């Protein structure tokens, strides 16, 4: 690791305050030129620990940068991950205030709701499908505590993979009842089609991303628990949202999900 414990704590505090005050900070990679990936995960886990001490509960996890184009843009060869707390996960038709975020964007994903524990390494796609009770259409609201989304890979890792909120649809399906690779999705903003995509864009199959995360977390001594929600990554490019927007999204075979921004 390139940062001292004091620098790591300073960086974690800066991100935490940015989220609370909605005042973004300069990229950590600029303020701490020696910041590496392990430092970045150390910063993320420091803030996770603080939230757990404050009484919050981890409800699941997210995978970011599952699209090869995004990884190429940041010069990395693997995705990243973040933690999802109970306070972040909401049901469809959720309403948000734009004032609660800095520069929010939305993505479309197929959320995996687990019925069994999973602990890597050694987890396969088949293991993931057997352990999944339901796959739901979901909107992930992402937000960067780094000003102007000027992020390097280490910045978004430290910033909990830019996680903010997850909105889950009400229907869904068993992943054993459809071929998720072929499921297409669409996201509308104020009635206008903004983005379309296919789940094959998520590492070939969203369950591949879930297996990757189970194995990555397993090497850190973390396991999925029954009831966890795992967000495998978006099938579309992120769409900016602002006050007054109404978002509708749908995934073939899974249903739809909505949110409005007040």
Explain the meaning of each model-derived region.
Residues 210-238:
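A conserved acidic, glycine/proline-rich C-terminal tail/linker
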């Amino acid at each position: 690791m390139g940062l001292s414990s004091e620098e790591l704590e300073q960086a974690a505090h800066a991100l935490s305050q940015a989220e609370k005050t909605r005042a973004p900070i300069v990229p950590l990679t600029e303020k701490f030129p020696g910041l590496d990936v392990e430092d970045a995960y150390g910063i993320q886990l420091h803030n996770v620990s603080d939230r757990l001490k404050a009484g919050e509960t981890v409800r699941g996890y997210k995978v970011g940068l599952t699209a090869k184009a995004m990884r190429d843009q940041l010069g990395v060869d693997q995705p990243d991950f973040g933690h999802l707390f109970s306070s972040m996960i909401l049901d469809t038709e959720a309403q948000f205030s734009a004032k609660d975020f800095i520069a929010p964007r939305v993505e479309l994903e197929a959320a995996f709701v687990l019925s069994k524990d999973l602990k890597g390494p050694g987890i396969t796609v088949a293991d993931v499908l057997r352990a999944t009770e339901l796959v739901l259409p979901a909107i992930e609201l992402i937000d960067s505590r780094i000003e102007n989304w000027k992020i390097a890979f280490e910045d978004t890792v430290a910033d909990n993979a830019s996680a903010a909120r997850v909105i889950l649809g009400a229907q869904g399906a068993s992943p054993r009842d459809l071929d998720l690779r072929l499921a297409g999705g669409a996201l509308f903003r104020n009635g206008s089609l903004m983005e379309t995509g296919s789940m094959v864009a998520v590492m070939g199959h969203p369950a591949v991303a879930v297996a990757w995360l189970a194995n990555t977390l397993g090497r850190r001594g973390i396991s999925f628990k029954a009831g966890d929600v795992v967000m495998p990554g978006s099938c579309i490019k992120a769409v900016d949202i602002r006050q007054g927007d109404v978002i509708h999204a749908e995934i073939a075979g899974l249903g739809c999900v909505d949110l409005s921004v007040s």
